[in-house]
């Protein structure tokens, strides 16, 4: 069965078609398995026709679909989730990204300097040049609302977070434009003709039925590989068991990257991870317990050997804290009662996003510690001696005691002879009771993937674009080197998703679909 989808006969309102057909409309998303390239291919039960097909409904995918429809292309978006799970990782996003006061030139210089030109300078230059235009388009065309003063997504006023609100706003606008959504349809194969030109995708739903979408252009925006243990470990050389994926919904399995690799696509810094701060799994990550207990420069970090392993001021930057904490098997923070009282009376020294202001008292800190001490999943421990404290976890006790004594000597001397921490953050561990926080490194997603150029075209092994194939968001690599640049460009992952989606649609409309009217 073939279904022709065009601007003349807009099939609006078929948002849950795939999910309903599969009998899974009530499931928003589910843990998936990696794509199996050896799985037998089957004939489709239904075939669709369009100009532009997008795989993935996050920020990049929605932006690509919206811009394509605005430009007159018949557009279909397929997504592994059902309608309730639309948006993927982007549902939890907070920032859109912004252009500094110095404009495009300052943004470009900040980015290439931070990445030491490990990013693609051509891609970065166009990103900087187009960033404000795409931000304005997001606000003016899509209707996404930002908080006053910063480009943070505004909540809807009914408790829905900003990222999810932005996704729903974009989704509704896409439907108005005539974009057709096929949910519960996991893209698993990009189709090409004998000349190597992309001709569409095949998708499979949760009951194994296959559909085919024929198109002149395919944009891979499936959300990266944050939920794929094998792919994460292959690219990063970090054990997946030592990290917590805070951004994944169970469906970010690297599908876009896998499909691109099957066509011979090159990769660009696939190891680049958007790390965030250490967290206390099972506890509110924005509460006083986590922000004040495991994210402060005036604490001490210890690994499983009892060694202090860094200047704790690295916690102020997600990338530096991620880089150094990912080298440890365990991450423990040890503080004393004086520190707890200091937090309650004087506040934090390290600001974590918009949660607690530096110098603002946090009187609830002790109460949150006490509540955590009686939880069934202990992440916080209390004892009158360091020996008793360390007995609760897998840490070398003698080494820990020696490290604390050495560090206290550094405080007396006013100089950290090991890691040269700023003296203002040197604080002794000496007043009982003592507290240990057993934290774990967390990350949101990858920020590298298929190599793309300044039009979001996927680059093949011959260093030429694969005609008709695009990638965006966490499926695409080019803007970032091996790290996430949150310290100089907060929200750049969201803005990259927007810009890369916009680029793909613009290029496809101008180069691949000549029938479009000017």
Please tell me what each predicted stretch does.
Residues 189, 399-483:
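A glycine-rich dinucleotide-binding beta-alpha-beta segment and adjacent secondary-structure elements
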Residues 41, 80-180, 184-189, 301, ...:
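Conserved N-terminal/central alpha/beta ligand/cofactor-binding core
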Residues 74-79:
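Short beta-strand "acidic-cap" motif of Rossmann-like dinucleotide-binding folds
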Residues 130-211, 216, 228-232, 278-281, ...:
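Conserved redox-cofactor binding core of oxidoreductases
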Residues 209, 214-280, 490, 494-503, ...:
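Glycine-rich loop(s) and the adjacent beta-strand/alpha-helix scaffold that form part
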Residues 46-58:
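Beta1/beta-strand and adjacent pyrophosphate-binding region of the FAD-binding site
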Residues 1-17:
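N-terminal secretory signal peptides and thylakoid transit peptides that target proteins
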